[in-house]
Amino acid sequence: MKGKTVNKQTLAALVSALLVFNPAVADEQESAQMTKPKGAAATGTAKAFQPKSKQFWWPDQLDLSPLRDHDSRSNPYGESFDYAKAFNSLDLDQVKADIDQLLTQSQDWWPADYGNYGPFFIRMTWHSAGTYRTLDGRGGAGGGQQRFEPLNSWPDNASLDKARRLLWPVKQKYGEALSWSDLIVLAGNVALENMGFKTFGFAGGRNDDWEPDMVYWGPEVEMLASDREDRDGKLQRPLGATHMGLIYVNPEGPKGVPDPLGSAKNIRTAFSRMAMNDEETLALIAGGHTFGKMHGAHKPKDCLGAEPAAAGIEAQGLGWHNKCGKGHSEDTITSGLEGAWTQAPTKWTSLYLSNLLTYDWQQTRSPAGAIQWIPTDESVHKAVPDAHVKGKFHAPVMTTADLALKYDPEYRKIAERFLADPEEYRLAFAKAWYKLTHRDMGPARNFLGKEVPQGNFIWQDPIDDKTQSRLSAGDIKQLKKAISKSGLSVAERVRLAWASAASYRQSDMRGGANGARIALAPQKDWTVNNPAETAKVLKTLEAIRADFNKGAGKRQVSLADLIVLAGASALEQAAKQAGFEVAVPFTPGRGDATQAQTDENSFSLLELHADGFRNYFDVNHSYKSPTEMLVDKADQLDLTVPEMTVLVGGLRALDANYQGAKHGVLTQRPGTLNNDFFVNLLDMSTLWQKSDVDGIYQGLDRSSGKPKWTATSVDLIFGSNSELRAVAEVYAFDTSKQKFVDDFVAAWVKVMNLDR
């Protein structure tokens, strides 16, 4: 290069080359660029060579990534792996024995409090399951999401990285036969049993995830921030926790204010959104806080390093390195609170309730500066043994959240009752713990193993097995014929079948066609289901069912099956009218639930306030835009982008909109299964513009200006969004008419069978 002028472009190329060929320089630069304050959000500075998503440049672009996550290609076991079969091959007694042995084998790199990892594992289990929330069914123990960001780096999960590492020998031994998500829950059960508690049961069957869930955990951009309540103090839907990075509530009190009654309000909200009533809430808190201690030996900001997600590569996924004292044992720091609740932290007792109700409590601070409480009675200030230093004793402690259970009148009544009746208390905690750790597993058929308790709980949405259909091919043909002669239109049958099946959500495997709860309260009265039409169609189908069952002997048809069959017959009729012969796959065997088997309050949380597939949107109750809610619903139905696309187009052609609205019905042949929606949406002779009605668009003839169609944003997004348009074009091809019908039927059948 000597004697030549080096321009800026050449210089830049040289610098890039140096980075490529000098790993030390490249790593140093990468490290510098990745370093940011603990818990900080992105600063806006672009990381070198990092591609940017379209949402980076255009934040309002619809994000379709929820429909592409958890791809089977991410699973190292492959699509054909049968986890249920693998789990059932385990010797569960031996697995539990291995965990039990591990509990008291204290490791030098992370010594056990009181010589027992039991309380530590209980916290791990609780925090894994406790992310579950009822409003959208997301969170929970399933998938083992505690292993991944952001949960593995939440402040409330500090040190739980070590708990999972302690369990690694057990996981390594049993491999694919024992998922992390099952192991994390089982470890909590074994810990309880080790410390003298009789658990209610355990069910395996949780499949592991291989990547983080895309979940909205709150609006905040900093950990421990709280900006999720409206002016009336109501927690934003669908959230359950009060702060970013916490499982439930701030233990020091609302936004750090030591107000027990205010804390009680937050606790009631948070636990109710986790499907727990007051009795279950108190049992869980009291039972959980019977064991172990809190850790706040020093101020976190002075001692703790970065959380796992921000720690250096050499940390190998561990975080919160503690540079103070030993870095563990009596120098351990997690929440910043310090101390144990009871005098026997590794035994099942009623001491938590006794301490809470017996003593008056005075406010103090932990060594880390966190607000907590100790008894005013100094005689018990040396009652609690130190977790690591022999001969050292402390006072029992309570948090503001604990005192909420004493000062809230309703919680106190329950606490006093439990203290007076230890067996009632034990059973209440056992059942609440079982519910906590199994709430996101769906119906009882998903529960595996010898320790599954007999019977069904109401929260498992039971269905009467005796009502399951046992139909022959001839029976199905006979029923289809009766349905076709009933006078029910294609649209009516399609709407009812969709309403029944589309209540399903994969997040906690609730809802769906099985059980025919579309005929029961509260589902039959949901606005989205058009109650008047639903009642009419159900009445007709009930008559067909009664007539068939009268002479069918043991081959009875359930209402659940008949609803799905009515939808299938409607599709076959609509396809035939469009010129296609289709046999819609139908597999009987669904049963019917009773009203007594249906918790109305619990099922009310499944109500759809937006269903883009029916072009329904309730602006007063939806927390996202119509198009975002469409993607959210498609995600809950486990749909891919093409499946979502073909279903919307087909349902519009079938005239299946809410209350028969014509928005997006871009066809002159409504009620037939055709691809007109895509053909007409992409037709350049149509000019789309906003109408005078908010959320409604008008399609005008580009030449004459005459109105042709109306549509919503959910319809137009398939022509506007580049990714969706690419798929829509496929279904608009002249050569894709058969493909459209086949793909629609396949996606429809998938939705009908999601809960099976």
Swiss-Prot record:
Pfam families, per the entry: peroxidase
Keywords (A to Z) from UniProt: Heme, Hydrogen peroxide, Iron, Metal-binding, Oxidoreductase, Peroxidase, Signal
S-S pairs: none
Marked site positions, Transition state stabilizer: R123
SUPFAM superfamilies (UniProt xref): Heme-dependent peroxidases (SSF48113)
UniProt crosslink position (Tryptophyl-tyrosyl-methioninium (Trp-Tyr) (with M-274)): W126-Y248
Tryptophyl-tyrosyl-methioninium (Tyr-Met) (with W-126) crosslink, residue number(s): Y248-M274
Residues making up the signal peptide according to the UniProt record: 1-26
E.C. designation(s): 1.11.1.21
InterPro entries tied to this protein: Catalase_peroxidase, Haem_peroxidase, Haem_peroxidase_sf, Peroxidases_AS, Peroxidases_heam-ligand_BS
GO molecular function, one term: metal ion binding
Catalytic activity, as annotated: H2O2 + AH2 = A + 2 H2O; 2 H2O2 = O2 + 2 H2O
Cofactor: heme b
PROSITE patterns named in the record: PEROXIDASE_1, PEROXIDASE_2, PEROXIDASE_4
GO terms for biological process, alphabetical: cellular response to hydrogen peroxide; hydrogen peroxide catabolic process
Cofactor notes: Binds 1 heme b (iron(II)-protoporphyrin IX) group per dimer.
Entry keyword Lipid biosynthesis: no
Keyword Signal: yes
Cellular component terms per the entry's GO annotation: cytosol
Binding residues for heme b: H289
Catalytic machinery residues: H127 (proton acceptor)
Annotated family: Belongs to the peroxidase family. Peroxidase/catalase subfamily.
Role according to the record: Bifunctional enzyme with both catalase and broad-spectrum peroxidase activity.
Quaternary organization: Homodimer or homotetramer.
The protein's name: Catalase-peroxidase
Lineage: Bacteria, Pseudomonadati, Pseudomonadota, Gammaproteobacteria, Alteromonadales
Name of the coding gene: katG
